[in-house]
């Protein structure tokens, strides 16, 4: 029995089945205070048809609050997440909220579709839910046909 275990061990070594332990590494894609933003929240990540990682986030300009000037940004990685591009602005609507990024990749065409929300920057969540806000929360769609390097103009689809 002892000989069988020793033989199996050497067979495994020779076949390459025994591998060294993998070292896990982490990378902070978005950091507080980076690129002129106070805070980044609500991340979403997808892999494009070309293999590029796209990390979306809400970029909160003045604070980590859910109201005020919130932009949608994306960072790209073409090396499996080892390095990341600077933030690319997907949608900036001044002092309003552009948020809740929900990316989808069309595996046939390669188009990256981004569903997101918009509301007035001065409207608070409770007001929106209670229907006492100045405006409502709306749903928009944007897309990229060049692997997330640039984005279409947002199109409202709330009633669709």
Tell where the protein language model's regions lie, with residue ranges.
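Sec/Tat signal peptide C-region and signal peptidase I cleavage site
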Residues: 17-21
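Positively charged n-region of N-terminal signal peptides that target proteins for export
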Residues: 1-4
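Bacterial N-terminal signal peptides
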Residues: 6-16
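Asp-box/BNR beta-propeller blade signature and adjacent active/binding-site loops
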Residues: 22-160
């Amino acid at each position: 029995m002892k000989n069988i275990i020793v033989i199996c061990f050497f067979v495994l070594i020779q076949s390459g089945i025994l591998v060294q332990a993998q070292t896990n590494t982490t990378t902070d894609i978005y950091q507080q205070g980076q690129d002129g933003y106070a805070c980044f929240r609500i991340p979403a990540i997808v892999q494009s048809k070309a293999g590029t990682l796209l990390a979306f986030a809400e970029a909160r300009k003045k604070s980590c609050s859910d109201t005020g000037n919130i932009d949608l940004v994306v960072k790209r990685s073409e090396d499996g997440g080892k390095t990341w591009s600077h933030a690319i602005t997907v949608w900036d609507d001044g002092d309003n909220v552009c948020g809740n990024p929900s990316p989808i990749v069309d595996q046939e065409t390669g188009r990256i579709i981004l569903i997101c929300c918009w509301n007035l920057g001065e409207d608070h969540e409770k007001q929106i839910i209670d229907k006492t806000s100045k405006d409502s929360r709306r749903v928009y769609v944007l897309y990229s046909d060049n692997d997330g390097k640039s984005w279409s103009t947002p199109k409202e689809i709330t009633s669709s």
